[in-house]
Amino acid sequence: MNARVFILLLLLAARSAAAEHFPVTVESCGVPVTFNQAPQRAVINDINMAEMAFALHLQDRIVGLTGITGWYKLTPDFKAAMGAIPELAPKYPALETLLAAQPDFFFAGWNYGMKIGGDVTPEKLAPFGIKTLVLSESCVQAGGRPQKADMNLLYDDELKLGKIFGKQQEATALVEGWQRRLAALPARPAGQPPLKVFVYDSGEEKPFTSGKYAMPTAIIEAAGGRNVMDGLPASWTTASWE
């Protein structure tokens, strides 16, 4: 058999196998969202969600990023992973900006590219054929059930991405790898209190920091520490220096 024909058959078989997984339904802040096929033109907001997508090697499905350079300085590794993917907006994208990219999928969160009552929300994107996955950590911003942040929020969202893009096995392997790495961390010596950590994001007169519902609290706890602001019943919020 001609080598090119053989490779083509392998590609077609892989595509057919992936198609068998659809339709799939995932929950986005408690709302079921059904995908009849994997997104082909995704837009991803914020560096953390972009890295979640890059971890599944979804670059060939991404037509743009938003909310990157307006908030962050890029590392060489992130620049390499981003490659030629354009940044459509340095901070929050306007509806017109998103529509110009003709996406079929938007991965963002409340206060991570979307604002309650704004022009870019799942409800306002739906009429244009754009399905939205909302970052689970941010659901509390939209009145979702308050839930103290834990690593399962990250794991669940990564598994949802895998399901949406037909990469369930890759997502499962990725999450299991993360879990093994955490489990391998040495335990804190008996009787030793956890290291107290303050998360500083920005602000001078008042610090902008993470509270009980934000992922830094979960990450710090997973590493054996304690966020000193874990009593704040909020996700990201302004606190006082006192």
Regions found by a protein language model. Give the residues of each.
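Extracytoplasmic/secreted envelope proteins and their assembly/folding machinery
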Residues: N36-Q40, D46-E51, L95, G118-L125, ...
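A short, structured surface patch at a secondary-structure boundary
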Residues: I44-A101, F105-M114, V228
